[in-house]
């Protein structure tokens, strides 16, 4: 938990980050989730990014990398980004199995670090909101105490906080019951540290950009199936898979953009009522 990744980027005016989330890979590459072959959609996303891969200083993978909790699924994830020069850090989602995830990704040379120092101005902290076996999230007392310690010992660093589950309602009642259950406790910790201005999550398979008590909360599309916004019941969207790029600036500001495939072949089974 205390492992640290340091990116010595002194003199850089900005840091570019690639976020990939909710790949939902299987041990068998031919398998599909809700009608979408997740390996093929992941590969299509990576192929769209690849011409620009030299631009990124860091890759962040924000959970649900595997659908079937297999070691092979995590190996496939690592295989996909193996040619990217930027280091990758990760956190678990509700579908992940952490023993297999940790082992397979570490064997592939992917860092288990949950704290990243970027140059002299920024840090990224990755939180584990998984409650194993259920879809909702919660931050343990240990996680909250760890977060408070790390924020307190680097008050001079602008901070980007990563977690899988969304702490604010996304506007989908079926999905919001699977949000971060103790968001109030997280808010209490963050209220002490005004240098935390940005939070980034996955989980909801859609784009989100909200204000949370003066902090900017961002969520990012999945590389496979998409959930339709503002729906009371489980509803799939036909919009293409996506990813997010972020730029961290020395003055503490953040700029970001969501990208989607131009490819329209990854259409889900819209008759599905859940998974």
Residue ranges and their predicted role:
Residues 14-27, 122-131, 160-162, 216-221, ...:
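Active-site-proximal beta-strand elements of phosphoester/diester hydrolases
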């Amino acid at each position: 938990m205390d492992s640290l990744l340091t990116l010595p980027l002194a003199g850089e005016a900005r840091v570019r980050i690639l976020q990939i989330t909710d790949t939902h890979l299987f041990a068998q590459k031919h398998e599909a989730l809700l009608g979408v072959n997740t390996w093929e959609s992941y590969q299509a996303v990576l192929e769209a990014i690849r011409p620009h891969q030299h631009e990124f200083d860091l890759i962040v993978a924000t959970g649900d990398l595997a659908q079937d909790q297999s070691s092979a699924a995590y190996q496939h994830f690592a295989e996909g980004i193996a040619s990217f020069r930027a280091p990758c850090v990760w956190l678990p989602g509700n579908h992940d199995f952490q023993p297999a995830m940790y082992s397979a990704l570490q064997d592939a040379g992917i860092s288990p670090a949950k704290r990243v120092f970027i140059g002299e101005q920024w840090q990224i902290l990755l939180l584990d909101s998984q409650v194993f076996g259920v879809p909702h999230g919660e931050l343990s007392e240990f996680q909250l105490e760890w977060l408070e310690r790390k924020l307190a010992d680097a008050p001079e660093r602008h901070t980007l906080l990563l977690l899988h589950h969304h702490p604010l309602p996304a506007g989908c009642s079926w999905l919001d019951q699977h949000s971060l259950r103790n968001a109030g406790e997280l808010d209490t910790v963050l209220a002490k540290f005004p240098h935390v201005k940005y939070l980034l999550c996955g989980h909801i398979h859609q784009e989100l950009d909200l204000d949370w008590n003066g902090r900017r909360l961002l969520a990012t599309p999945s590389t496979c199936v998409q959930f339709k916004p503002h729906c009371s019941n489980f509803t799939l969207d036909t919009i293409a898979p996506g990813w997010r790029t972020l730029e961290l600036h020395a003055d503490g500001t953040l700029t970001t953009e969501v990208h989607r495939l131009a490819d329209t072949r990854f259409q889900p089974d819209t008759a599905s009522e859940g998974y």
